[in-house]
Amino acid sequence: MKCFAQIVVLLLVIAFSHGAVITGACDRDVQCGSGTCCAASLWSRNIRFCVPLGNNGEECHPASHKVPYNGKRLSSLCPCKSGLTCSKSGEKFQCS
């Protein structure tokens, strides 16, 4: 009986769901607004989102420093904001 109830709930969820809408999706930096870049998703490199540029103390990718970048970014991290640099801090890279 418990399994039957779970199946009914699952079918109701499927019937009333409308699918996911991805806002801020992009392919390249030029599609994003000022102060953002088009970074790859952590879950799938084929999905990209407009993400804010890194602030002081936030994690960054050392090879990803040009905005707008003409190609497709492979990193899920944006470059640092203007005036900040991406430098190694312990085990990771941070904007400073």
From Swiss-Prot:
Family: Belongs to the AVIT (prokineticin) family.
Disulfide bonds: C26-C38, C32-C50, C37-C78, C60-C86, C80-C95
SUPFAM superfamilies named in the record: Colipase-like
Primary location recorded for the protein, binned into one broad class: secreted
Keywords in alphabetical order: Disulfide bond, G-protein coupled receptor impairing toxin, Secreted, Signal, Toxin
Organism, scientific name: Bombina maxima (Giant fire-bellied toad)
Entry GO terms, CC: extracellular region
GO biological process: endothelial cell proliferation
Annotated signal peptide: 1-19
The name this protein goes by in its record: Prokineticin Bv8-like peptide 2
Disulfide bond keyword on record: yes
Compartment list: Secreted
Expressed in which tissues: Expressed by the skin glands.
Top-level taxon: Eukaryota
Described purpose of this protein according to its UniProt entry: Potent agonist for both PKR1/PROKR1 and PKR2/PROKR2, and inducer of a potent and long-lasting hyperalgesia. Also potentiates capsaicin-induced TRPV1 current when tested on DRG neurons. At subnanomolar concentrations, this protein both induces potent chemotaxis of macrophages and stimulates LPS-induced production of the pro-inflammatory cytokines IL-1 and IL-12. In vivo, potently stimulates the contraction of the guinea-pig gastrointestinal (GI) smooth muscle (nanomolar concentration) and rabbit aortic rings.
Pfam families for this protein: Prokineticin
The UniProt record lists the keyword Signal: yes
GO molecular function: toxin activity
